C-alpha cells in the first residue's frame, strides 16, 4: 500500500507542488509540479534595461542653431500715431479715383459748371456711333461723381441743389443719346425688312456689274464687292467687327461663288471647281477658304485646290453647325493675324 504526501511552495514567482509517495517496500518517489504566475512573473523578471542608462558624455563641438528666435529682438515701443488722412497712402491709379473729380473730396456749388446745357437731338444725330458712345460714358462718369457728392451732402444735411441741377442736365443728354440710337436701330430694321423684298433683283444687278468689269480693273471690281458684302450681309473687312449669324454665313457662300465666277474664265481648275459645285458654293468651310483668299488669280487657284482636297477627304461642315464653326474659324484667323503682327 502506498502513502502520498503533498507539499506546496512559492519561490521567485513560481508555484511548486511536491508529491511524495512511499510504497510497501519503503521506496520513496517524488514528483515536482510547477505552475508559473504570469502576471507577477513578467513584472518581477530581470531585464537588460532594469538599470538606467548613463548620461552621454558632453560633446565638445556642437553646431550653433540656425535661428535663435522667431521674433525680432530690436523692437522698440513708440508713442501711438493718431489716425489722420495724411498717414494713409493710396495708389493714384486706383480705379475708385474715377468717382472723384480731380481727386477732390467734394466740389462746392461755385466749382460746378452752371453754364452748360444738354445736347439737343439734332446735334446728336450728326454724331457717329463712336462719338455717341464716348459721350454716353463721359456723362455716366459725371453722374457717378455727382451721385457720390449728393449722397455725402445728404448725410451732412447740406443743400445740394446745384449738384442736382447739373445731374438733371447730364441725365437729359443721356436719354437723348438713347433716343438717337433707337432711331438708327429702327431705321436699320425697316431698311433691312424692305431690302428683303428687293434683295434678289439688287444682287442680280450688282452681280452683272461685277462680272462685267474688265480684268485690268480687278481692284475696282472687288471694291464694289466689299461695299456689297458690308451693306447686304454685314461682313466687315475688320475681323473683330463681324457678328457671325445666318446672314453672315450666307454672305460668305455668295461672295465665294462670285469670286470663282470672276476667275473661272482665266483658269481651267477654277472653272472645273465651279462646274462641280453646280454653279455655287454651299459648304461653309469651302466658302471660308475661298473668301479669305486674296483677290488674285494665283490665290484663288490655290484656294480651289484646297477645296478639292477637302472634298476628296470628305470634310464638310454640317448646316446646323455652320455658325459655330465659322465663328471658330474667324477667332483662329484673328489670333493668327495678331501673332503675325
UniProtKB/Swiss-Prot annotation:
Locations listed in the record: Mitochondrion
Protein name: Large ribosomal subunit protein uL29m
GO molecular function, one term: structural constituent of ribosome
This protein's GO CC annotations: mitochondrial large ribosomal subunit
Subunit (UniProt): Component of the mitochondrial large ribosomal subunit. Mature mitochondrial ribosomes consist of a small (37S) and a large (54S) subunit. The 37S subunit contains at least 33 different proteins and 1 molecule of RNA (15S). The 54S subunit contains at least 45 different proteins and 1 molecule of RNA (21S).
Gene name tied to this protein: MRPL4
Gene Ontology terms: biological process: mitochondrial translation
Superkingdom to which the source organism belongs: Eukaryota
Extent of Basic residues compositional bias: 48-62
Keyword Transmembrane: no
Keyword Nucleotidyltransferase: no
Region of interest: Disordered: 44-74
The species this protein was found in: Eremothecium gossypii (strain ATCC 10895 / CBS 109.51 / FGSC 9923 / NRRL Y-1056)
Entry coiled-coil feature ranges: none
Record-linked PANTHER family: LARGE RIBOSOMAL SUBUNIT PROTEIN UL29M (PTHR21183:SF18), RIBOSOMAL PROTEIN L47, MITOCHONDRIAL-RELATED (PTHR21183)
Organism lineage string: Eukaryota, Fungi, Dikarya, Ascomycota, Saccharomycotina
Keywords: Mitochondrion, Ribonucleoprotein, Ribosomal protein, Transit peptide
Similarity comment: family membership: Belongs to the universal ribosomal protein uL29 family.
Pfam families reported for this sequence: MRP-L47
